[in-house]
Amino acid sequence: MVGVPHRLLSSPCGMRIKDTMYKRYIKRLFDVFVAVVALLLVGWLLVLVAVFLHFANKGAGTFFLQDRPGKDGRIFRIVKFKTMTDERDVEGNLLPDGQRLTKVGRFVRSTSIDELPQLLNVLKGDMSLIGPRPLLVQYLPLYTPEQARRHEVRPGITGWAQVHGRNAISWQEKFKLDVWYVDHCALMTDLKVLWLTVVNVLKRKDINSATSATMEFFTGNN
């Protein structure tokens, strides 16, 4: 298996949380149904945003592709709208994120539209609508066994941690919320997360600021 060692994918007592009928079967059907409906409803918007980003990004491309760890640590390629240019300084180094973030990109980020292409990841089975966010591959060896339990479910476009602080909480708090979700995954929980996600997006709550395009890196100690 590629990704997280097996020892990191079990609970501290060595026992996995038993799958429920919802977790095992219904959640996937729910994901596919909602993703298809969402793409039919917002497909026109994705095309429009892609056109604007094509020009705003100054040739840097429209989509951002990156390897991320999914369920059981298996690596997949996530797709997002690219919101920054590839502008560099005189020494050839990329400019700080805040300077490369375009006006169009700032709007796309503030409304979380940049995450919508991940509906394709959901249809492919790499992701779920709701689940712990897929983080960087380089974080895998830094997790404690308890933190690594976040990989027992498919990663999500949004999740329990995202509607309870998102970028305003510490990594430790975020991982605790992720593991809580793993143990309490249910239809009503997912519906609540979807509702709170819509509310937070409309309020522009806990979104990265225009001058801070990305959050701090996880080091294993922060």
Model-derived features: positions:
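Acidic, Ala/Val/Gly-enriched low-complexity intrinsically disordered segments
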Residues: V2-V4
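Glycine-rich flexible loop motifs, especially short His-Gly-Gly/GGXG/HXGH segments used as catalytic or interaction
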Residues: R7-V36, Q66, R166-L187, T197
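A hydrophobic, helix-centered structural microdomain
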Residues: K18-D86, V193-N222
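An acidic site on a long C-lobe helix of protein kinase domains
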Residues: Y25-R28, W44, R100, S112-Q118, ...
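Short, hydrophobic secondary-structure boundary micro-motifs
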Residues: V49, F63-F64, N93, I130-P132, ...
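Short, glycine-rich, amphipathic interfacial segments at transmembrane boundaries or analogous
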Residues: G61-R100, T158-K176
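A short, structured surface patch at a secondary-structure boundary
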Residues: D97-R154, L194-T197, V201
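Cytosol-/stroma-facing membrane-proximal "stalk/adaptor" domains immediately downstream
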Residues: R150, R154-P155, W160-S209
